[in-house]
Design a protein with these regions (language model features):
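Aromatic- and glycine-rich beta-strand/loop motifs that create alpha-glucan
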Residues: 1-16
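Helix-loop-helix units of permease transmembrane domains in multi-pass membrane transporters
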Residues: 2, 66-99, 246
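Helix-capping/transition residues at the boundaries of transmembrane alpha-helices
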Residues: 8, 69, 80-82, 147, ...
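Residues that define the loop-to-transmembrane-helix transition and helix capping
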Residues: 16, 77, 88, 157-160
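Secretory targeting signals
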Residues: 23-67, 91-160, 193, 221-222
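Terminal transmembrane helical anchor/hairpin motif
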Residues: 35-38, 158, 163-244
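Hydrophobic/aromatic residues in alpha-helical transmembrane segments
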Residues: 57-64, 77, 112, 146, ...
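Short cytosolic juxtamembrane segments of multi-pass membrane proteins
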Residues: 247-251
Length: 251
């Protein structure tokens, strides 16, 4: 199942996405010296990783939300679940297949990004960038799990909207918690605490701003390990929920 998803998605415009990333980086490298003469290196470092994240997010959301609904709409899900394959294998196969695509996509974009840094003679810390990219992959893999979870029980359009909402709220979940404390309103504070517990704290997996300053700017190895474990655990919980919901659906 995972290999089928991988082959299907890889041949479905992934090369165009990589080409688009390369083109945007080339344009940015050309125009940044004209608009930010003294800080173009730092901006390009930030921009390259941020663009990777945006592209990975788009692929995760739009492909992930449609993986299950496409099978349902085409009625091929009936054939698949009739085979000696459990519904849990169906969900996890979809997840790991798309995660493999995202891994290939992120790896390829990273190689291209590092190539541009070399061409432009922009100093960078290879270790910090690779760690940031690894955590970026964990983040978009988590969003992949969110997308598949919503796609297991809603329409593709609603799943896209809900997944983007989770992404946006997940990036400001710590700010929501601080806002609740500052409000000094028990009702608002309880609401923001509940949202923080439910929503993924995606800021734990976002290291792009620190990575450009080198390893010394990154969290400690213990904090990195805990944050990586958090991302993996949250993704596993989402998959468990998706499997539970999908196993109760009738076709």
């Amino acid at each position: 199942m995972a290999s089928n998803v991988f082959q299907e998605v890889i041949r479905d415009r992934i090369l165009y996405i990589i080409g688009f990333y390369t083109l945007i980086l080339a344009v940015a490298m050309r125009i940044l010296p004209e608009i930010a003469a003294s800080t173009e290196g730092k901006i390009f470092l930030d921009f390259g990783i941020a663009l990777m994240g945006v592209i990975g997010l788009i692929v995760s959301v739009f492909v992930g939300t449609g993986l299950i609904n496409k099978e349902i709409e085409k009625r091929t899900v009936l054939v698949l679940i009739a085979k000696p394959i459990s519904r849990s294998e169906f969900i996890t196969g979809k997840y790991f297949g798309l995660s493999a695509v995202l891994a290939v996509l992120v790896t390829t974009m990273t190689v291209i990004y590092l190539g541009f840094l070399q061409i432009a003679h922009i100093p960078y810390g290879i270790a910090s960038i690779l760690i940031a990219v690894l955590f970026l992959f964990l983040q978009i893999s988590l969003i992949n799990a969110v997308a598949i979870s919503f796609g297991s029980f809603t329409s593709s359009l609603l799943a896209v909207i809900l997944t983007f909402a989770v992404y946006l709220m997940g990036n400001i979940s710590q700010d929501l918690l601080k806002f609740g404390r500052l409000s000094q309103n028990p009702g608002i504070e309880h609401l923001t605490q509940a949202l923080y517990l439910i929503l993924p704290d995606l800021s734990r997996l976002d290291l792009k701003n620190q990575a450009v300053y080198g390893l010394q700017a990154l969290p400690s190895p213990t904090a990195l390990a805990m944050n990586a474990g958090y991302g993996l655990l949250y993704s596993s919980m989402l998959l468990a929920i998706a499997i539970l919901i999908f196993s109760r659906r009738e076709f």
